[in-house]
């Protein structure tokens, strides 16, 4: 039950080519690439303000909580 042999991968590749055809696979890969580019652009847009300057880091406050002594 180890990894697949080369013949297994060739059979899988042949089935994929039969199902999708030669023209459909590059189209699918192009759509995936466009999605990745769009995602990266969206992530980089979150890091900049509308005027193009980087947003300042969020200032967080440290709050110390102490248990009250109940006697």
Curated annotation (Swiss-Prot):
Signal peptide start-end: none
One annotated Gene Ontology cellular component of this protein: TAT protein transport complex
Keyword Membrane appears in the UniProt entry: yes
InterPro entries reported for this sequence: TatA/B/E, TatA/E
Subcellular location: Cell inner membrane
Subunit and partners: The Tat system comprises two distinct complexes: a TatABC complex, containing multiple copies of TatA, TatB and TatC subunits, and a separate TatA complex, containing only TatA subunits. Substrates initially bind to the TatABC complex, which probably triggers association of the separate TatA complex to form the active translocon.
UniProt xrefs under PANTHER family: SEC-INDEPENDENT PROTEIN TRANSLOCASE PROTEIN TATA (PTHR42982:SF1)
Name of the protein: Sec-independent protein translocase protein TatA
Lineage of producing organism: Bacteria, Pseudomonadati, Pseudomonadota, Alphaproteobacteria, Hyphomicrobiales
């Amino acid at each position: 039950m180890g990894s697949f042999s080369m013949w297994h991968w060739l059979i899988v590749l042949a089935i994929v080519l039969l199902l999708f055809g030669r023209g459909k696979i590059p189209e699918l890969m192009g759509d995936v690439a466009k999605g990745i580019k769009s995602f990266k652009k969206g992530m980089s847009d979150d890091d900049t303000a509308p005027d193009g300057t980087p947003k300042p880091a969020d200032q967080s406050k440290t709050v110390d909580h102490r248990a009250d002594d109940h006697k």
